[in-house]
């Protein structure tokens, strides 16, 4: 009896240890709530907070959560009807962030998810379900008491708009605008304009099920810039000379 019990427990433990991460659900885009702010501690966390951007939505959707801590992901919105239809809620915003040393500098990527990318109201060419946009802030050293801002890059379709002197508040918080030049879809630019900060969720503090959901979900024509597969390629493109 004892042998049988031990064998059963061992089998259960082995199965649990080897079990893959459970696939979670695709849920309505407005059913997800922003995760409470969660960033790493220490000097790197301080730098992430110091250079937190302000985002202004000049056109299109407000930012929404893309995923939760159970691995459920947003189903997004069809790119039809009003360009802001179903995605006007200003209380849903979430900023995703990842930081790390790269090529002798420190990079912080701040990213936002929008349920659809629709350059104009109606059924127009160029729109699509899901949109991911981001900026990269380049510092000399996040472990310094006062890191130096070396430049920044804003996502622009498949590339970046780069600058050594992005518009900022207090010299550290980049001012970022989400906009479109019809008929092209949305992109980001650095611009002096009103903006908001949103709760930040750091890649370093996310559970594995959330990281897995971000990495394995089919986001259509959009892609998550800060997952492992995209992190360094994006930083290469976003480099500021």
Predicted regions and their residues:
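Fungal secretory targeting signals
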Residues: 1-23
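A domain-level signal for the mature, folded cores of soluble proteins
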Residues: 20-133, 148-241
